[in-house]
């Protein structure tokens, strides 16, 4: 909870007759949506919501975003129980917003972020063994279609060199020609080609739907904003189902949407692929 002193400071910072921080962020979000940069728009939206809570709804001009303000916001995030990487995420977004404001001459160049962490701590990459992959594949999920889909997506990712969930969600039938999957990673734009091996083909055929352009029943529309919202809901649901699958395996493990990618990389390294 904000102190009386902090509340008084925020009220005194409220901007008049200039572009304020939250207003500027809303404009940036609108521009990103118009450019179909929906992932970045989503991150800005999360940060704006968080910052609005910190400011208790009182918008401020960029001239008031100084080292003291950033320090108080940093402390606010920590008090909410966020880990260092999460705090850094919000700081990096706000720094990007601030730098855009500098380029648009809304504020004089400065660096109020000097005393806060804006890096990314390395997290432990959790891979599972080929034995666990085999156990997962053999699970009888005939009466649990949602779990079966989550399992099949995980196996598909593993068999396609760790294809990311976002790329699986957006994968279309048109991406498959002459027994080869070709697609561009949505994160990097990197073009990849993967041969459709029997295990991959079996999963693709299991979810074939004549009326859908997509390979898997994850997205239902090609409209960018609606498709992105469906993807956001789907990845959360996918990770929830993977937690349930983890509890069904004999070996103690934790499956996430990243595990299949790390597991493939580990297996490839072990086999000198």
Model-predicted regions and their roles:
Residues 1-49:
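N-terminal DNA-binding module of tyrosine recombinases/phage integrases
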Residues 99-107, 157-178:
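Short, charged phosphate-coordinating catalytic segments
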Residues 144, 239-273:
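Short, basic (Lys/Arg/His-rich) helix/loop patches that form interaction surfaces
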Residues 26-39, 49-124, 139-142:
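N-terminal core-binding DNA-recognition domain of tyrosine recombinases/integrases
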Residues 116-165:
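Basic, Lys/Arg- and aromatic-enriched nucleic-acid-binding interface segment
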Residues 133, 197-252:
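Active-site/catalytic core of tyrosine-dependent DNA strand-transfer enzymes
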Residues 115, 170-206:
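Conserved tyrosine-mediated DNA breakage-rejoining catalytic core shared by Y-recombinases
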Residues 64, 107, 120-138, 190-197, ...:
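DNA breakage-rejoining catalytic core of tyrosine-based enzymes
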């Amino acid at each position: 909870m904000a102190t009386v002193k902090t509340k008084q400071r925020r009220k005194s910072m409220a901007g008049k007759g200039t572009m304020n921080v939250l207003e500027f962020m809303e404009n940036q979000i609108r521009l990103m949506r118009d450019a179909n940069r929906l992932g970045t728009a989503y991150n800005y939206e999360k940060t704006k919501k968080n910052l609005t809570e910190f400011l208790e709804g009182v918008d401020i001009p960029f001239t008031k975003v100084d080292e003291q303000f950033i320090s108080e916001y940093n402390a606010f995030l920590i008090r909410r129980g966020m880990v260092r990487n999460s705090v850094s995420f919000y700081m990096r977004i706000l720094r990007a917003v601030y730098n855009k404001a500098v380029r648009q001459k809304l504020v004089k160049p400065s660096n109020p972020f000097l005393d806060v962490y804006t890096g990314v701590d390395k997290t432990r990459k959790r891979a599972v063994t080929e034995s666990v992959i085999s156990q997962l594949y053999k699970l009888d999920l005939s009466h649990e279609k949602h779990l079966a889909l989550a399992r099949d997506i995980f196996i598909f990712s593993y068999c396609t060199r760790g294809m990311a969930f976002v790329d699986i969600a957006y994968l279309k039938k048109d991406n498959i020609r002459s027994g080869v999957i070709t697609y561009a990673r949505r994160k990097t734009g990197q073009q990849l080609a993967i041969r459709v091996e029997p295990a991959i083909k079996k999963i693709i055929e299991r979810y074939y739907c004549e009326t859908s352009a997509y390979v898997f029943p994850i997205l239902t529309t090609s409209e960018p904003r609606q498709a992105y919202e469906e993807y956001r809901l789907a990845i959360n649901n996918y990770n929830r189902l993977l937690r349930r699958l983890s509890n069904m395996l004999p070996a103690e493990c934790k499956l996430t949407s990243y595990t299949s990618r790390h597991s493939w990389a580990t297996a490839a390294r072990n086999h000198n692929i």
